[in-house]
């Protein structure tokens, strides 16, 4: 059972598609013990919902600002969100 202190929806813009951003996000989120999902958007952005302890979410948001090698992040927008059900893992969705 996972205990989530909060969940945040994050929209990352810039050169973030075609550089492995979703796979990098999943790997970083798993390392931090976060759950949720990440997907590419039609407009070229990447959107993720991350759930877990405040400190891990803050760390992940800072990592989003840098991104993986090959990415060039121009903006990271966050907003608190409510989850319909607690995710038990971190997934890449389409």
From Swiss-Prot:
Family under the similarity heading: Belongs to the acylphosphatase family.
Region listing for Disordered, in residue ranges: 68-94
GO molecular function, one term: acylphosphatase activity
Keyword Metal-binding: no
Organism phylogeny: Bacteria, Pseudomonadati, Pseudomonadota, Alphaproteobacteria, Hyphomicrobiales
Keywords: Hydrolase
Bilayer-crossing regions: none
Active-site residues annotated for this sequence: 22, 40
Polar residues composition bias: residue spans: 71-85
Sequence ranges assigned to domain Acylphosphatase-like in this UniProt record: 7-94
UniProt EC number: 3.6.1.7
PANTHER family hit by this protein: ACYLPHOSPHATASE
Natural source organism: Rhizobium johnstonii (strain DSM 114642 / LMG 32736 / 3841)
Listed name of the protein: Acylphosphatase
Reactions catalysed according to its record: an acyl phosphate + H2O = a carboxylate + phosphate + H(+)
